[in-house]
Amino acid sequence: MFETIIDAINTFLYSKLLIVILIGSGIYFTVRTRFPQVRLFKNACSAVMEKPEGDESVSSFQALMVSTASRVGTGNIVGVSSAICIGGVGSVFWMWIIAILGSASALAESTLAQIYKKKGKDGQCYGGPAYYIEAALHSRGLAVVFCIAMILTYAFGFNMLASYNLQSTFSGQPFYNAEITPWIIGGILALVTGWCLLGGGNRIVKVTSTLVPFMGIVYILISLLVVVLNIGQLPSVLAQIFEEAFDFKAIFAGFAGSAMMQGIRRGLYSNEAGIGSAPNAAASAMVSHPVKQGLVQMLSVFIDTLLLCTATAMMCLVSGVTPAKELQGAPWVQAALHKTLGSFGPYFIMIAMVLFAFTTLLGNCFYCDNLLTYIHKKQPDRKFMTGFRIVSALAVFLGAGMEMTLLWHISDVLMGVMALINIPVILLLSNTVLKALKDYEGQIRQKKNPVFFSKNIDLKQKTDYWN
């Protein structure tokens, strides 16, 4: 009964409501900001390497790595392969579309997070959708609802799913026992995650800023090797992606399993553009202008979908291995690499899944620290945070042994609720984003390092950081 209800909500959200909202808002911000994905790409790359104002402050690069740690996860492997298995090859195209359009929404939401952020007693900055919902719309109630939805999504839904996806990569090993092994792997992952979480936000930032660049670069290099070894298949694969993407039978027939719906679902799960998660990391960065971090988070969407998700799709499709009922998700990716790289392939995917899942868990819990600080109106005391982190680690343990389809559906619904709150809000505040972008570009044209003050854009609401 519960699964039927969740599935019905999912189908409604992703076959009607969210498709219109996500694509519509992406087009709106892309046009209103005059295609920043192309026009300001160079500025985004420059902003990543800027040093923070203080030695203990979070840099743009570290904020990028935390948000990318959450974006770049098991969804880049399992999500992509599942989308292709269910929606067909054309779903890859729709993942690209939602990433390109969504990157403009990511620019908007992260710029707003910077504008309305607050500085805590510990010297760190806190912000995100909850902060700009209350400051600009004067609705703390809606802000708290968003926080609760996001905590449920990330600390439980996404983390449980990441744990399941990780243990599933071991299913082909001789020692794997379906009744025992998932719980053992879940227990080990929960213990390691708990150790990092109990070290607090600084430990999370340090771990993710080390692991994310390393694993991303290695993953892309291996995918390029696989494509080069199967280069003869590439033209037909690309042709098939575009052909199925615009095949109206594939797009609309049985919409729950269509190319468009699966591409948007899994693309959104992977890159998180517009749902209000990354702004929590973006707000923590110490920068001289809010738009700088907006551009950095736009870049994070590109890294996640246009690089890493595409890498998975191409590795699988050029290999010639056809997915089947018993060969979906991570096992399909492992089989594809095994055909090209031999026994090294499955082990590489296993290692990649361990790193992807681990950094996802840490990035997700970093977000929850920010949300709990907002709900409590101050940093929660140590006992509360210790208890929350233990419960979060327990969710990681439980997720390893749960049923995959139910976990996907629950995560999709929770993610959809976040998008339904955040996207209308950033649309209402779009003029603030446009004014900040105009101020940034005006200073760039004068060959200045952009510095922001709220009076520069005649901001009516008082800001805590930029006055």
PLM ranges: what are they?
Residues 2, 18, 32-37, 75-80, ...:
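Transmembrane helix-loop junctions in multi-pass membrane proteins
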Residues 21-28, 32-45, 165-170, 181-229, ...:
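Membrane-interface loop-to-helix entry segments
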Residues 54-86, 112-130, 134, 151, ...:
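Alpha-helical membrane segments and immediately flanking helix-loop junctions
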